[in-house]
């Protein structure tokens, strides 16, 4: 019996380490950033709660005085956010099938592959028409302005999405005293294109840490929309 146990133990030691649970089908989901919903890119981990995000995705959270984890909403020390080297190693080791052509690709190269995969592009072209995440009785016009990108009110830099605008203004215009119009608010139905914020950076970090387009019913006024969007954002986490 002792010899049998010894042989079993020896065989177990020679077996390669198992990959993540769930097999190939759930592999990509296990390494998906909760913010951008894509495979991690340059992942970082919050020291206190251990949650992992793409480095760029977490950046806007690091610009506020008292940052909260986007996933669990617990406060964390921005100085204790470290590069998730163990996750990076796993991204380079594990393969998963492309969601379009089913070709197996290492997770570290999945974003690049998907961006050029003809099957994925074909699927995207055939996507159903957008519908709101919250039911609404209001009609959805087809000619609404594109609120996805904005221009910097300080220097005019264009094609910035909401997170990029926050990051750009914090990094490039932190000390700029000029009063400027918020391009995000002015694009809203209730927005006043002539109203200039006395402290635009504070306004940007307070009001625009989430996307209005994801949560807002545009038929209600600004304050009601903000409160509704904030409540829905919190309820989803």
Curated annotation (Swiss-Prot):
Q: Which reaction is recorded as catalysed by this protein?
A: S-ubiquitinyl-[E2 ubiquitin-conjugating enzyme]-L-cysteine + [acceptor protein]-L-lysine = [E2 ubiquitin-conjugating enzyme]-L-cysteine + N(6)-ubiquitinyl-[acceptor protein]-L-lysine
Q: Where are the zinc fingers (C2HC RNF-type)?
A: 98-117
The UniProt keyword set, sorted, is: Autophagy, Cytoplasm, Immunity, Innate immunity, Metal-binding, Transferase, Ubl conjugation pathway, Zinc, Zinc-finger
What Pfam families does the record tag this protein with? zf-Di19, zf-RING_UBOX, zf_C2HC_14
Please give the pathway this protein is involved in.
Protein modification; protein ubiquitination
What are the boundaries of the signal sequence? none
Checking InterPro entries in the record gives: Di19_Zn-bd (IPR008598), RNF_E3_ubiq-protein_ligase (IPR051438), ZF_C2HC_RNF (IPR034734), Znf-RING_euk (IPR027370), Znf_RING (IPR001841), Znf_RING/FYVE/PHD (IPR013083), Znf_RING_CS (IPR017907)
| Binding residue positions for Zn(2+) | 98, 101, 113, 117
- Provide the protein's localization: Cytoplasm
**GO molecular function annotations of the record:** ubiquitin protein ligase activity; zinc ion binding
What's a single GO BP term from this record? protein polyubiquitination
Gene Ontology cellular component list: cytoplasm
Q: What class of enzyme is it?
A: transferase
Give the EC number(s) listed in the UniProt record: 2.3.2.27
Give, as residue ranges, the zinc fingers classified RING-type.
33-73
Q: Which PANTHER family match?
A: E3 UBIQUITIN-PROTEIN LIGASE RNF166, ZINC FINGER, RING/FYVE/PHD-TYPE
Q: What does this gene product do?
A: E3 ubiquitin-protein ligase that promotes the ubiquitination of different substrates. In turn, participates in different biological processes including interferon production or autophagy. Plays a role in the activation of RNA virus-induced interferon-beta production by promoting the ubiquitination of TRAF3 and TRAF6. Also plays a role in the early recruitment of autophagy adapters to bacteria. Mediates 'Lys-29' and 'Lys-33'-linked ubiquitination of SQSTM1 leading to xenophagic targeting of bacteria and inhibition of their replication.
Protein name as annotated: E3 ubiquitin-protein ligase RNF166
């Amino acid at each position: 019996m002792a010899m049998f146990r010894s042989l079993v133990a020896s065989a177990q030691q020679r077996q390669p380490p198992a990959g993540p649970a769930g097999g190939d089908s759930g592999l990509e989901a296990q390494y998906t950033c909760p913010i951008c919903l894509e495979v991690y890119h340059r992942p970082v981990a919050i020291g206190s709660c251990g949650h992992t995000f793409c480095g760029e995705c977490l950046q806007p959270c690091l610009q506020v005085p008292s940052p909260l984890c986007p996933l669990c909403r617990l406060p964390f020390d921005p100085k204790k956010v470290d590069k998730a080297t163990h996750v990076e190693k796993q991204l380079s080791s594990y393969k998963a099938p492309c969601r379009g052509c089913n070709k197996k690709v290492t997770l570290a190269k999945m974003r690049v592959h998907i961006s050029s995969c003809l099957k994925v592009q074909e699927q995207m072209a055939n996507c159903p028409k957008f519908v709101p995440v919250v039911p609404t009785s209001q009609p959805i016009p087809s000619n609404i302005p594109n609120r996805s990108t904005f221009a910097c009110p300080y220097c005019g830099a264009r094609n910035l999405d909401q997170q990029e605008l926050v990051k750009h203004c914090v990094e490039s215009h932190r000390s700029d005293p000029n009063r400027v119009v918020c391009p995000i608010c002015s694009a809203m139905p209730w927005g006043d294109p002539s109203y200039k914020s006395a402290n635009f950076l504070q306004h940007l970090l307070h009001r625009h840490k989430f996307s209005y387009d994801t949560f807002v019913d545009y038929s209600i006024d600004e304050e009601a929309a903000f409160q509704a969007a904030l409540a829905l954002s919190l309820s989803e986490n």
